[in-house]
């Protein structure tokens, strides 16, 4: 089973951050209701200081984890947060990311409160940092902060294909003898000591869907 749930709606936003904001019981009713993608500061068309959108701010999302999530892998993905992000679930730090131009994912399966409300808190630092691209040299565009791309949750089986990399290998200067190499990463978010056997069958097809090759399982 695999299902994707987009998490663009239902976020709370505050232009400041304090450590108590990560706590589940923190009252955010008076915060601004926002939808992703979102920028931490609305700016006029001209005549404004670039420091106006450089800040440490906070996003919070309340969500219910149903019983059917109990035996599944639950992964939350942010497509882009500018420029540093710290993520907390129910007051506990679960991950961080340092780049506004790359996506990142966090497995929250074992930290969820099943059958209850959960609170995801994101501390966003949009200030310039010379250690994070594109800062460190001259740039000719504005580097707005915030959760400025989409967010979503993927529901997967406890054991799932995490990544597949298919590439060819052709020896240089030799008679054409190409190899097709398939690298597959399998993850198990269930019991770590549980042994499982898998059979993976891969096929290659042309755009016309004509079958070309079935790769061996070894």
What residue spans do the PLM features occupy?
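Accessory beta-strand-rich segments of carbohydrate-active enzymes
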Residues: 3-17, 39, 54-163, 189
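Extended low-complexity, serine/threonine- and proline-enriched intrinsically disordered segments
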Residues: 9, 87-89, 197-208
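Predominantly extracellular/luminal regions of secreted and cell-surface proteins
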Residues: 12-36
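Surface-exposed, low-complexity/disordered Ser/Thr/Gly/Pro/Asn-rich loops and linkers
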Residues: 46-50
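Short beta-strand segments of immunoglobulin-like
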Residues: 165-173
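Contiguous beta-strand segments within globular domains
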Residues: 173-185
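A short beta-turn/strand-edge loop motif at beta-sheet boundaries
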Residues: 189-198
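Conserved small/polar residues in nucleotide/adenosyl-binding loops
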Residues: 210-217
